[in-house]
């Protein structure tokens, strides 16, 4: 693997950080590996791969924040899909992109702003036009990602209402295995934050499960 020191003198190393969805699905993993390979084939040194469990509709994603903190000037963030970067409302999504650019980094998303387009040599008016088009495409893609997220939530809400009306809705199924792990860890003295991290859920969910279990024990 190339390092900064191994590059020929005078040649600037192109560095990328890749942001992905955490997945165990074989097809998703193959697609992600293809993205990593394509980034390297484009001449980029991959300084980090960040696999996120949290939803793109959240601004406080741990891996996203870690990646932004790691960014150095001149680097490129390569996202698997635009909705991995953000499903936030457009204003919040633009602030997120601005925080990446504030570190002196650029954003590349296949099909929106490709690595080849970022590397394109342009000066003067041509450069301004190219960057303006890239910004417009990125803004449009961010808005479409948010619209898709809201459409999915609305369809889910309508589905729940129809199921309730038909007497078929029973609510979200309990994950017995996850609940058991939470109870075991908390009973062993693990903090709420540590338990949430180990189990892969939110601290609020740990609190709910633990409170429900304690209430059951007191009956």
From Swiss-Prot:
Name of encoding gene: parA
InterPro entries according to UniProt: Recombinase_CS, Resolv_N, Resolvase-like_N_sf, Resolvase_HTH_dom, SSR_resolvase
Any one Gene Ontology BP term: DNA integration
Keywords, sorted A to Z: DNA integration, DNA recombination, DNA-binding, Plasmid, Plasmid partition
High-level lineage: Bacteria, Pseudomonadati, Pseudomonadota, Gammaproteobacteria, Enterobacterales
GO MF entry, a single one: DNA binding
Similarity remark: Belongs to the site-specific recombinase resolvase family.
Identification of the protein by name: Resolvase
Protein role: Involved in plasmid partition.
Record flagged with keyword DNA-binding: yes
Annotated signal peptide: none
Residues covered by the Resolvase/invertase-type recombinase catalytic domain: 15-159
Coiled-coil region list: none
Any Pfam family matching the protein: Resolvase
Highest taxon listed in the record's lineage: Bacteria
Claim: Plastid is one of the keywords in the record: no
Active site residues of this protein: 23 (o-(5'-phospho-dna)-serine intermediate)
